[in-house]
C-alpha cells in the first residue's frame, strides 16, 4: 500500500498530515508534481517524482501507477474518477472521501461548471483552505488509512485464491478430520 499525493495543488497542511501518518504507520508516500516539491527531512518513506510540464501529466502518472488498495490525495475530479475505478481510496484535501457512490455526481458538477466557464459565465472559485478543512481531512485520512491497512493485512500479496487447495500439511499432533 502506498499513498499518492497530487502535489501541484495540495495544501501544505495536507502534505504535513500525510507525512506524519507515513512516519507513524510506516507507509510509503509519493508526491507527484510538474515542479520540484520539498520533502520532509529524515523520512525515507517519502519520495517525490517530478514529471514534465503539461496538462494532466502528473495525473496520468498517478493513474497509471496507483494500485488497488492504495490511497490517493487529490482535488482533481477526473483523476479521482479514474482512481476510484481502479479501487484506490481517494480523499480530497477538504476531507471528502470520493468513491463509487459520489464520484459520478462530482464529475457531472465539475463538467457543468467547466462548460459554464467555457461559455463565459463567471463562477466562484474554491473557498480558502480552512482549519475546518484541515480537521476534516485529518479525520478522513485516519479512517481511510485504517480501512486500507485492514484490507492490506487481510489479503497478503502472494496469497493463493480462496478456492485454491491448501498445500500445507496439518501438524503431526493435530486431530485430523476423517471426512476430509
Regions found by a protein language model. Name each.
Residues 1-163, 168-180:
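Nuclease catalytic cores that cleave nucleic-acid phosphodiester bonds
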Amino acid at each position: 500500500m502506498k499513498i499518492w499525493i497530487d502535489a501541484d495543488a495540495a495544501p501544505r497542511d495536507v502534505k504535513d498530515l500525510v507525512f506524519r501518518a507515513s512516519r507513524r504507520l510506516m507507509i510509503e508516500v509519493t508526491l507527484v508534481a510538474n515542479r520540484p516539491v520539498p520533502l520532509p527531512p529524515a523520512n525515507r518513506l517519502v519520495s517525490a517524482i517530478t514529471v514534465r510540464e503539461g496538462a494532466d501529466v502528473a495525473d496520468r502518472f498517478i493513474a497509471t501507477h496507483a494500485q488497488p488498495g492504495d490511497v490517493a490525495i487529490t482535488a482533481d475530479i477526473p483523476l479521482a474518477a479514474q482512481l476510484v475505478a481502479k479501487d484506490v481510496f481517494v480523499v480530497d484535501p477538504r476531507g471528502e472521501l470520493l468513491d463509487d457512490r459520489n464520484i459520478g455526481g462530482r464529475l457531472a458538477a465539475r463538467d457543468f461548471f467547466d462548460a459554464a466557464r467555457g461559455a463565459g459565465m463567471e463562477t466562484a472559485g474554491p473557498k480558502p483552505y480552512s482549519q475546518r478543512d484541515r480537521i476534516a481531512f485529518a479525520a478522513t485520512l485516519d479512517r481511510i488509512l485504517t480501512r486500507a491497512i485492514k484490507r492490506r493485512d487481510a489479503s497478503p500479496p502472494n496469497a493463493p485464491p480462496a478456492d485454491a487447495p491448501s498445500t500445507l500439511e496439518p501438524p503431526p499432533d493435530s486431530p485430523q478430520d476423517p471426512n476430509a
